[in-house]
Amino acid sequence: MTNIRKSHPLMKIVNNAFIDLPAPSNISSWWNFGSLLGICLILQILTGLFLAMHYTSDTTTAFASVTHICRDVNYGWIIRYMHANGASMFFICLYMHVGRGLYYGSYTFLETWNIGVILLFTVMATAFMGYVLPWGQMSFWGATVITNLLSAIPYIGTNLVEWIWGGFSVDKATLTRFFAFHFILPFIIAALAMIHLLFLHETGSNNPTGISSDMDKIPFHPYYTIKDILGALLLILALMMLVLFAPDLLGDPDNYTPANPLNTPPHIKPEWYFLFAYAILRSIPNKLGGVLALVLSILILILMPLLHTSKQRSMMFRPLSQCLFWILVANLLTLTWIGGQPVEHPYIIIGQLASIMYFFLILVLMPTASMIENNLLKW
């Protein structure tokens, strides 16, 4: 008799994806972040669902409804802070996951990589719209500043912005539609994640060496299920430490002031996970140029397979490329710091230099280093 998990139409899919899946025997903890992202997404959908039961997407009551959730709803405070800090954990896992892909050359799986970049954009859009919902000062002004960037698009810009706003400013219509989009997008993300996984399982996972591991596979269960459970426990530990000991550590105090269109906060800045892109946006004194740089800072990931000039896939045995990779990481951390600073000397010039360095590293230095390494190995 055949095993039900191998014969049942639904269980067969689960079996082939999570149980009998042939996995490389040498994948490190950097390969844990895929499953952690799945856990983050499920957690965000569940906490978000319970928040949506008590939230009202009306400009007059949105702020009060969030206060009501924290004060009056049973365990509302923990649900709210798990959702807010869950987003931070989500982005930490996302950036680690992308970094792993860059380091070990996983971008050579073209379909998987491109779906991944689309996923990154979708998650960023969802997080941005979610930040607008509490209708605090930073919610309102963040929404105003970021949506207003679209007015830099020639000819159709102004019409486009007013169409997104649903009026002549960020108002009730904007908040309502942002809530609608914020609710629906995570389900689209879940569908995209399944497609991401579908394409990945066509080729099988990459591994730290970047060499084919077809001759040395092990079943996903129990080896990697237990490893993923450990990762999940550490993720939940980190999240709950944030939620229970420092729930507002990563937030902005301005968002505890209700939105006021007549009073602009002294410093408008997004959540920490967008600061690097915000720094790139601000480093260019031209509006359209800034918007293009902002979009390209993420869209450049699409070009990674084209910029791969090395004869080796992974950076594991490429010291020069490794060095440049970690310089890129340091550069992104610098941009993140600059994005949170006021627009004044010396932060302006540091931001401009870091922005130039970001694109120069990816477009010029890393491909050149790869070619130098090829020559050194006489390949």
UniProtKB/Swiss-Prot annotation:
Gene Ontology CC annotations of this record:
mitochondrial inner membrane; respiratory chain complex III
| Location (main, coarse) | mitochondrion
Taxonomic path: Eukaryota, Metazoa, Chordata, Craniata, Vertebrata
Span of the secretion signal?
none
Residues where heme b b566 binds? 97, 196
Q: How does it assemble?
A: The cytochrome bc1 complex contains 11 subunits: 3 respiratory subunits (MT-CYB, CYC1 and UQCRFS1), 2 core proteins (UQCRC1 and UQCRC2) and 6 low-molecular weight proteins (UQCRH/QCR6, UQCRB/QCR7, UQCRQ/QCR8, UQCR10/QCR9, UQCR11/QCR10 and a cleavage product of UQCRFS1). This cytochrome bc1 complex then forms a dimer.
Segments passing through the bilayer: 33-53, 77-98, 113-133, 178-198, 226-246, 288-308, 320-340, 347-367
Sites binding a ubiquinone sit at 201
Textual note on the cofactor: Binds 2 heme b groups non-covalently.
Provide a Gene Ontology MF annotation, just one: metal ion binding
Cofactor(s) this protein requires: heme b
Keywords, A to Z? Electron transport, Heme, Iron, Membrane, Metal-binding, Mitochondrion, Mitochondrion inner membrane, Respiratory chain, Transmembrane, Transmembrane helix, Transport, Ubiquinone
- Organism the protein comes from: Tetracerus quadricornis
Q: What does this protein do?
A: Component of the ubiquinol-cytochrome c reductase complex (complex III or cytochrome b-c1 complex) that is part of the mitochondrial respiratory chain. The b-c1 complex mediates electron transfer from ubiquinol to cytochrome c. Contributes to the generation of a proton gradient across the mitochondrial membrane that is then used for ATP synthesis.
Q: Which InterPro entries match?
A: Cyt_b/b6_C, Cyt_b/b6_C_sf, Cyt_b/b6_N, Cytb/b6-like_sf, Cytochrome_b, Cytochrome_b_C_euk/bac, Cytochrome_b_N_euk/bac, Di-haem_cyt_TM
Q: Known CDD domains for this protein?
A: cytochrome_b_C, Cytochrome_b_N
Which Gene3D superfamilies does this one have? Cytochrome Bc1 Complex, Chain C (1.20.810.10)
**Protein family according to the UniProt entry:** Belongs to the cytochrome b family.
**Protein name listed in UniProt:** Cytochrome b
One GO process term, biological-process aspect: mitochondrial electron transport, ubiquinol to cytochrome c
Which residues does heme b b562 bind? 83, 182
Q: Where in the cell is it found?
A: Mitochondrion inner membrane
What further note is attached to this protein's record? Heme 1 (or BL or b562) is low-potential and absorbs at about 562 nm, and heme 2 (or BH or b566) is high-potential and absorbs at about 566 nm.
Q: Name the membrane topology term.
A: Multi-pass membrane protein
